[in-house]
Every structure is written in structure tokens, then in C-alpha cells.
Amino acid sequence: MESPAFSKPLKDKINPWGPLIIMGILVRAGASVQRDSPHQVFNVTWKITNLMTGQTANATSLLGTMTDTFPKLYFDLCDLVGDNWDDPEPDIGDGCRSPGGRKRTRLYDFYVCPGHTVLTGCGGPREGYCGKWGCETTGQAYWKPSSSWDLISLKRGNTPKGQGPCFDSSVGSGSIQGATPGGRCNPLVLEFTDAGKRASWDAPKTWGLRLYRSTGADPVTLFSLTRQVLNVGPRVPIGPNPVITEQLPPSQPVQIMLPRPPRPPPSGAASMVPGAPPPSQQPGTGDRLLNLVEGAYQALNLTSPDKTQECWLCLVSGPPYYEGVAVLGTYSNHTSAPANCSVTSQHKLTLSEVTGQGLCIGAVPKTHQALCNTTQKTSDGSYYLASPAGTIWACSTGLTPCLSTTVLNLTTDYCVLVELWPKVTYHSPNYVYGQFEKKTKYKREPVSLTLALLLGGLTMGGIAAGVGTGTTALVATKQFEQLQAAIHTDLGALEKSVSALEKSLTSLSEVVLQNRRGLDLLFLKEGGLCAALKEECCFYADHTGVVRDSMAKLRERLNQRQKLFESGQGWFEGLFNRSPWFTTLISTIMGPLIVLLLILLFGPCILNRLVQFVKDRISVVQALVLTQQYHQLKSIDPEEVESRE
């Protein structure tokens, strides 16, 4: 730079202080983020750190996706400087230790150089990465430093009028007009550039800031910008075995075991009691899964009747088959085991997906503390903790309606109070019909609403204020009892599949369990009881209930939509839907037909013009030939002849 203001030698721009020990600060806060979906919401915190002192100058948190969480960050220059600059010329009095120094600092320009991408000759932390002119990429100076590739821009903010000589309102000068907390009167505004919004922020990034002075060395400070990401609504597996993603393909459909009619007692069997009811039969696969969908429909129809006017309820073929919603509730203490602590109500299955925050008991590890709104420690003694109606304890050892404090005190087990909901997804009819018609194009996959999202928290009053039935009425209704009964029946059937393989590895048992569930849904699909939508088995439901023959209902609805679509078309548009080869035929012969039509329209005119042109040329040629056979006679004037005579 040729300007006199930039003519200071490089050695004057370098402060004679030793190297900074900042590697630990640079490494400590970065963490990579694994993105599952571009639409997933995170809790993003941006932190600006003064690397000279290690203090935080700004920490701003907001909720959003990874593509739109780039806010403006407001802080003060003195937050990056501390009490004073590391200045070789302290007699000048710049810095932030005194009101006068803060006021003088406000009068100077500043420039910023990136440390995350250091250009050749720009130096290191000692020079603030500004070892020569041209390294600066942003700042507030009269030459307006800028860059098209740096990640941020840093400018001065608006200083209120009458702010005064930067007095600190927290000390004795608080009564002076214009005093501010900490005497901050050098506001800065940090904005992200387009390059910064596209960059990876998995690790902290560093910049150097220098105060521009026409005489003397330019003081240096260093700061870093870090992004910290926390997942909102964590889905944390509870239990020793996480979800196994690999699933074996189904080999054969599962047969439904129909109940056999009771046989008459054999003659001479005096021990048989006449008129005794036959032993109860467990429901078959079809009945068990249909009861699960029916119970989900009844609970949804009770709480949100507007959503069940016409909808599709789908069972997923892959794990997890159940979801837990952590809730807060009041459990009851019992000195002896209550009736619901029987062996039949205990389940060895663990939940692989739990959302929300609720009541936790026991030694909860740090990996699962995000599920806890309140954590209670068990006291000494032997008693039982029974979960409220409609809830269950999800423990690291399995599902149970009641806890034994003796077991909790002797082991490292922990439990979370949850509502248990089957993994039933809710789809609108337009989405389902569009998938089968393959006409509707979605820019992105619609968010799947599950029963846990629609009804989660109702039993404990989480969203019961908007439900006319109320919390108590919902738990006590027959619809909710029907869903709970279907859940316990299905859990019992799933657990039997695992218990039959207890002698094998637990992971192998879960693989077989997943295969069994896929076979069950395959049987329903092959029987026409449900419609296969991707990896889900969907049942049609309206205000009349769940339709057993869902495939027939799907075909009926698709035919109705096709007729309605055709009735709204004109006769010309309808031609292309009558035959599959009609469109191909038209597109094939349309080109030659258009060319032939153009020839017939403009051909005669072009031909006439061509013939006339040829005739004109021939006439000219004939005239030339005739003129070559004759010569022009010399003209004689009669008066000249008479004069000669």
C-alpha cells in the first residue's frame, strides 16, 4: 500500500511479546455434528472467546436447523481486549482500564486478519496474522478492508448519543449521564458472510484484531469463534442393546392360529365339569396387530376427532416398534408389592427410543441425563414405587410398572417414567394416494407423525388442557383401556419370541424378533388387510372405524380419484389417457405431419416464384442472342444530303 498512512515499517507493527500458548483453547470446544436430516432442529450456541484472557466475550444460543442459525453477534471491543492492550507504548493510554482509555479507543480504526486461513507472509499469533498489508479481510477503517472468502465481517456498532466518557455505571460513576455497565462504549457487530454460512464449523476458528494508529505500533488481540450444537429432543436408547439396523428378509408368511372349537367331553370323564368354558386362546397375529391399530384409532378419535375423518394408520416393519415419552408424574409408595407388580406385567424388552424430559430415579448416567427433568434418589429401605395409571417405568433392565428400591440401591439400575406408545404413523389420505398414483412430487419427504407425537403427554396432562375429556377422563376411558390392553398383549407376544431364544445371544434374539415382526406384517399385506407403503403396513380409518379390507378400500379410493380427475379434463386431454400407446404415436408422427403441412401451405407460392424467376432469366438471354445477329444502321440527315447535291 502506497498511502502515507500505511508507510510504517513492518517491524513497528509487531509487538515484542512472546508466543501465545493457545492450542489448548483452540482444541477444547470443537465437536463435529452428525446430521441426520436437513430439517432437524438443534440448539446452537455461538461463542466468542478472548484468547488473551480465555474469557467469553459473547455467547448466543438459538434453536434452528444447521442452515439458518447464523445470527448477528453483538459484543464490545473491550471484551476482546481486557483491561488494557499488550501495548509497548503504555504512555499513549489506549485500552479499557480507564474511562479515558475506552473513549480514546473509540476514536481509532481497527482491522481484522484471519487465523484459520493464513496467507503467505501474514505471520502468526504474535502479529495477529497481520504481518503485512493485504492480510486484513474486514474491520472498521478508512480504507474499508473486505474479502470475498473470509467467514465473517466485523464492524463497529451504533454508539448512543450522549454516551459520555465511557464511565462504568456499576461503580461510583453510575449517576453520570451516559454511563454504561462496565463502561462499554465500543460496540461491535459480527455478521456471517455467505462463505461463513457454507463453511464447516466443527472446530473453533481464530482471528487477530489490531488497532490502527498513525504513530507507534498497532496493539494486537486474538479471538476465536466456536459453534456448539446440542440435539433438541434427544432419542436416547435405554437398555443394553441398541436398535439393530440389519434385518433378515422374510422367508415365509406366518399363519394365524385360529381357535379350535371345543370338543365334547369323552364318555366316562367324570372329572370334567359340565358347562366349563374352554381355555382362553391367545389372539393370532392378525387379531393382535389389528387390535393395536384399533386401539390407536380409538385413542386418537377420542382426543382429536378432526384427524380421524379420513386417515391412514401404519405399522412400521422395522424397529423400534414402541416409543417412550418421558413425563412427570406422582408415583405411589407401597411397603409390599402391589397387584400390578406381578410377573405377567414385567417385560424384559427395552426401549430404544425415548423423547421428552420426565421423572428419573436412580443413578442416571450422563449420556441419559437429557431425559431427566427431575432426578430423585432412593432412600434406604425396602418398598415399591408404582407408576401412575397410563405410564410405565423404562429401566436399563427392561419395562416394569413398579420399582423395588432394594434393587435400585444394590445395583446401578436407573429408570425413567414414560408413556408407552406403539410406533403407529399417521398419514393424510392425499399423501398415501399420491404415493400409489405416483403423480404427486414432494420436494422433501413429509414429516411422519407418530402416535407418540400426537398423544404424547396426555396421560400426565402435558397437553390435556386442549382436550375436552380432561386427563382423568382420558385415562379412565374404554378407548384408552383398549389401547393399553392391545399394547400389553403385543408386548407379551414379542417377549415370547425373545424368551424362546434365551439360551442364544441377546443380539441374535433381537434379530429374530425383527424378522418375526416383518413376517407378521407381510402376512397382513398378502392377505389384503393392509396396504404396503414403503416399509409400513397401512390401515384405512374414518369415523366409522378401522377398515379391515384396506387394500379394497385403497383401490376404491384410487378409482374414485381417477374418475374425478378424468371428469375435470377436456376431450383433448382425455385422449392421452385412453391408451398407453396413443401419446407415443402422436409424438412420433407429429413431426412429419407438421413438415408436410408446411410444404402444402407454402410450396405452391415458392414454386411460382421460382418459375417466374426462371422465365425472366430466359427472356434476358433470348434478347441478348437477337441483338448479336443484327447491327445498327448509321442514321443519315436529309438536310445534309441536299446540301451536298
From Swiss-Prot:
Q: Where is this motif: CXXC?
A: 311-314
Which keywords describe this protein according to UniProt? Cleavage on pair of basic residues, Coiled coil, Disulfide bond, Fusion of virus membrane with host cell membrane, Fusion of virus membrane with host membrane, Glycoprotein, Host cell membrane, Host membrane, Host-virus interaction, Lipoprotein, Membrane, Palmitate, Signal, Transmembrane, Transmembrane helix, Viral attachment to host cell, Viral envelope protein, Viral penetration into host cytoplasm, Virion, Virus entry into host cell
Q: What CDD domains does this protein's entry cite?
A: HTLV-1-like_HR1-HR2
Q: Name one GO biological process term.
A: fusion of virus membrane with host plasma membrane
Q: Where is the signal peptide?
A: 1-33
Q: Transmembrane segments in this chain: where?
A: 586-606
Chain positions of motif CX6CC: 530-538
Query: Annotated region Disordered: where?
Result: 259-286
Q: Where is this motif: YXXL motif?
A: 630-633
Q: Where is this region: Receptor-binding domain (RBD)?
A: 32-237
Establish whether keyword Lipoprotein is in the entry: yes
All ranges on the Cytoplasmic side of the membrane: 607-640
Can you name a GO cellular component term? host cell plasma membrane
Cited SUPFAM superfamilies: ENV polyprotein, receptor-binding domain, Virus ectodomain
Reading the lineage from the top rank, the first entry is Viruses
Q: Extract the coiled-coil ranges from the record.
A: 490-510
Q: Topological domains (Extracellular): residue ranges? A: 34-585
Site positions for Cleavage: R444, E445, L624, V625
Please report the PTM annotation for this entry.
Answer: Specific enzymatic cleavages in vivo yield mature proteins. Envelope glycoproteins are synthesized as an inactive precursor that is N-glycosylated and processed likely by host cell furin or by a furin-like protease in the Golgi to yield the mature SU and TM proteins. The cleavage site between SU and TM requires the minimal sequence [KR]-X-[KR]-R. The R-peptide is released from the C-terminus of the cytoplasmic tail of the TM protein upon particle formation as a result of proteolytic cleavage by the viral protease. Cleavage of this peptide is required for TM to become fusogenic.
Its biological purpose? The surface protein (SU) attaches the virus to the host cell by binding to its receptor. This interaction activates a thiol in a CXXC motif of the C-terminal domain, where the other Cys residue participates in the formation of the intersubunit disulfide. The activated thiol will attack the disulfide and cause its isomerization into a disulfide isomer within the motif. This leads to SU displacement and TM refolding, and is thought to activate its fusogenic potential by unmasking its fusion peptide. Fusion occurs at the host cell plasma membrane.
Domain notes for this protein: The 17 amino acids long immunosuppressive region is present in many retroviral envelope proteins. Synthetic peptides derived from this relatively conserved sequence inhibit immune function in vitro and in vivo. The YXXL motif is involved in determining the exact site of viral release at the surface of infected mononuclear cells and promotes endocytosis.
Q: What is this protein called?
A: Envelope glycoprotein
Which species is this UniProt entry from? Xenotropic MuLV-related virus (isolate VP42) (XMRV)
